[in-house]
Amino acid sequence: MKITSNNEDKRYMRYALNLAKRNLGNTGKNPSVGCVIVSKEKKIISAASTGLNGSPHAEKIAIEKSCADIEGATVYVTLEPCNHSGENPPCAELLVKEKISRVVISQKDDNPLVDGKGIKFLKDSNVIVDTGVLEEEANLINSGFLNRVKNGKPNINIKIASSADGKTALRDGKSKWITNDLSRKYGHRLRSTHDAILVGINTIISDNSKLNCRLNGLKNQSPVKVIVDSRLSIPLSANVLKI
């Protein structure tokens, strides 16, 4: 059932949500999910996020790496566990097999393959199920995946760097950055969580952008580069062609 969560549930779920953010944009066609297992004694005994390229699922990893007996434990998961077989085994069945007593879910999975079936299976197996804990925060993480499976459309985000008065550069065009170091790092973090980055040819010509992610530890998670250039005017010396 949907609950008004207590502070304890929120604390564990917030940890799970932070785990889900780790691989956001790098789990292939699968959502990036966070999972935290809490023992009957209220101790965290395992935690995991979805593997790179979407496999294994977070629940499976968390169960396999648990440091104690998980029978009777509570599982906090950011998205409804699946109950269908595909490239990965059904997570709902796995939780029942491990005799988990309670599952707290942040957001229901509207994927037609799931769509409440995981929750129903858990309840039919006498597992206590609570949903809706920090659901709005989970939706920010899951929105790209859910928009694709429900509507067949990608999530598109627009990044604009501007000054307080709405300007993007000096009049003479000599300004290099109007952003600070923190906002530039955030921009690179956004690149690491998206499949593609699109710019017009004028951006390439004026900024000589690389369009990659240059954050330590995330350099291999750069997006596909898409350049709108109907006249094929991109200079062969452009940085974007060297990477």
Each PLM stretch: what is its role?
Residues 31-33, 45, 156-158:
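Short loop/turn microsegments at loop-to-beta-strand junctions
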Residues 8-28, 148:
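Short, basic/aromatic recognition patches
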Residues 33-39, 160-161:
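Short beta-strand scaffold segments in enzyme catalytic cores
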Residues 25-27, 119, 133-161:
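Proteins enriched for Cys/Gly/acidic motifs involved in redox and nucleic-acid/cofactor modification
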Residues 37-138, 224-226:
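Zn2+-dependent cytidine deaminase-like catalytic core
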Residues 147-148, 157-164, 168-243:
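Active-site ligand-binding patch in enzyme domains
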Residues 16, 34, 82, 122, ...:
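Residue-level signal for inorganic ion chemistry
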Residues 12, 28-33, 71-74:
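Acidic, glycine-enriched active-site microenvironments
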